Amino acid sequence: MFEIKARDAMGRLGLIKINGKKIETPTIMPVVHPNPKKQTVSIDLINKLSDVIITNSYITYTTPELREIAENKGIHHLTGFKNVVVTDSGSFQLSVYGNVNVEPMEIIDFQEKIGVDVGTILDIPTAPDVSREKAEKELLETFKRAEDSIQRRNDRNYKLALNGTVQGSTHLDLRRKSAEVMGKMDFEIYPIGAVVPLMEDYRYREVSEIIINSKMHLPTNKPVHLFGCGHPMLFALSVALGCDLFDSAAYALYAKNGRYLTENGTLHLDELKDLKNFPCSCKVCSEYTPKQLQNMKEKERERLLAEHNLYVTFEEIDRIKNAIKDGNLWELVEERCRSHPKLLNGLRVISKYMDFIEKYDPVSKKSGFFYTGYESMARPEIYRHKQRLNRLKFDKIYVTSISEKINTPYSENLNNIPCDVDVLIKDSVFGLVPLNIDTMYPLSQNEIPDLYDFEKNYNNDFISEFLENNAEKVLDISTYNYYISHYNSKKECEKINPDLLRISRMLEYQYGAKIIDNDFEKLSVRRSKTSGRIRNVLLDKEVVFTVRASDNFLIPAKLGAEMLHKKLEFPKYRVIVDKSVEEFARAGKSVYSKFVINCDKELRPFEEVLVVNENDDLLAYGTNLLNSQELMEFDYGVAVNIRGGLKLE
């Protein structure tokens, strides 16, 4: 079972439940050697830090003394780990040595027998850059083994949860095919395999593309595990692309070679020996100086280095979780990707997949948009804004540039005369910003530094294309001035209600349709006494919409929900639920994923939605936590947080 608790980018703060045990994601599974004598870091420390470990069932199977303990007392006793134990099946050994002394079904049986929580099929880990023919042949064998493993588990009623590994080498179409085929099988977790050689060679562009092309075809309701990823510098980007789990022995292997992990890269202990203190405040680094560690006996030094590496690894995981909660994961990704030029390649390549990534990125966030570099121009918030400009049905447009010294929101810092012409400001980051929506997220909830000329020119093509597509609506300055002078007269000015013009455009931008045309004259607004900004939209003194202060989104009250239901064609902005939960929805209780039977296919996370039954009767209204695909695929967790229900009279 997997559910999403919080999200940002494609990253998910989630909860996996397996055999009555819980794993909070994203997280890393420390590799634990099945032989306790060969384990560098004490299992007591790992029990404190981690919800889950990964160990090797193949080594356990082929080592008689380990196998005996595991078969008699179980893998948890052998490793000393209390929570979720995941095992590899020998695929790693297969990739290194070319063969293993176990049959695919043998290792499935063995993983079940020793009480593994999550086992792994014996897939074929196809190396990067092999011929397409070889990659396809090995992929077909992996498919066969996957089907046989699922069948084996079902036929024998095994409790074992299974990893179904996505392969395909560096052939992206094969990765997509693998994800699609494996995704149709009943696996609990989907690892993306055979990427370690790419990471070792700093081929992060290809790693990013493999992750994205796999994610495109994997079910959204299952966790994704990036096999072999253990360096903290890569976690933020991988999480932002939708990876939930990582594993690695890097913490121990690096320590063996005297290497000291940081969230930005790797240092050798020799590079630190002249420092008074370590650049870290973990338990190890607080207790010892670099010189003290350097002068220790090899085994003790290795153990302490491994402990530091483990601490810094989990510290980065915690930092990512916090970034997801705060809605600033993209900023952390951009910071981390500047730690190495090749990692920056891994970030830059994702811009070509932004139409896919945008579907998973929340429409509003706790944190504002922080511009940290040229790559910020390609973020989903900007991509979505440019797409949603097409929702605004302009009649007359005036496009203009303004001084860079004028702060956002522009409408509050310009002397703009109300009229029926939509004024669009050329903006270096967002392309075009209509004054009537410029308070909405992220158009004024942002921090942007002074830009270089090449950054200022980034949106030139977008602006030119927009002007070309709307040529018949665009006014020149003379015509615009005519409208201004016309509406500047007292008689005409009284015909224009700038507040309701703004609200109308904001609703159109947010919901993609004209909402208040017929009710225009009956509506009024209430302003904040402190800021002077619109806070409520009223109909006969009753609240219809509240303008949320953090993002200026229009949040419907009961009247607003009824208005949206009337104006929006079915199934726009609707989540359709099973009749068994109609009463609960009307009572204002949260809607759970398993009761969703259909929805608007364009929904994004954190949109305001209408909850209806199959007859399109309005039951409730609230905020959806999932996008449209997730709403249809998830079986656990909350789908819509209800704001209010419509009780039957």
Curated annotation (Swiss-Prot):
Official protein name in the record: tRNA-guanine(15) transglycosylase
GO biological process terms on file: tRNA wobble guanine modification
Recorded family membership: Belongs to the archaeosine tRNA-ribosyltransferase family.
Residues noted as binding substrate in the record, renumbered to the chain: D123, A194
Domain annotation PUA: ranges: 572-647
SUPFAM superfamilies, A to Z: Pre-PUA domain, PUA domain-like, tRNA-guanine transglycosylase
Assigned keywords, A-Z: Glycosyltransferase, Metal-binding, Transferase, tRNA processing, Zinc
EC number: 2.4.2.48
Active site: D88 (nucleophile)
GO molecular function: pentosyltransferase activity; RNA binding; zinc ion binding
Main function: Exchanges the guanine residue with 7-cyano-7-deazaguanine (preQ0) at position 15 in the dihydrouridine loop (D-loop) of archaeal tRNAs.
InterPro entries: ArchSynthase1/Queuine_TRR, ArcTGT_C1_sf, PUA, PUA-like_sf, PUA_sf, TGT-like_sf, TGT_C2, TGT_C2_sf
Note on cofactor: Binds 1 zinc ion per subunit.
Catalyzed chemical reaction(s): guanosine(15) in tRNA + 7-cyano-7-deazaguanine = 7-cyano-7-carbaguanosine(15) in tRNA + guanine
SMART domains: PUA
Pathway it works in: tRNA modification; archaeosine-tRNA biosynthesis
One GO cellular component term: cytoplasm
HAMAP family reported in the protein's UniProt record: TgtA_arch
UniProt: Zn(2+) binding residues: C280, C282, C285
Cofactor(s) listed in the protein's UniProt record: Zn(2+)
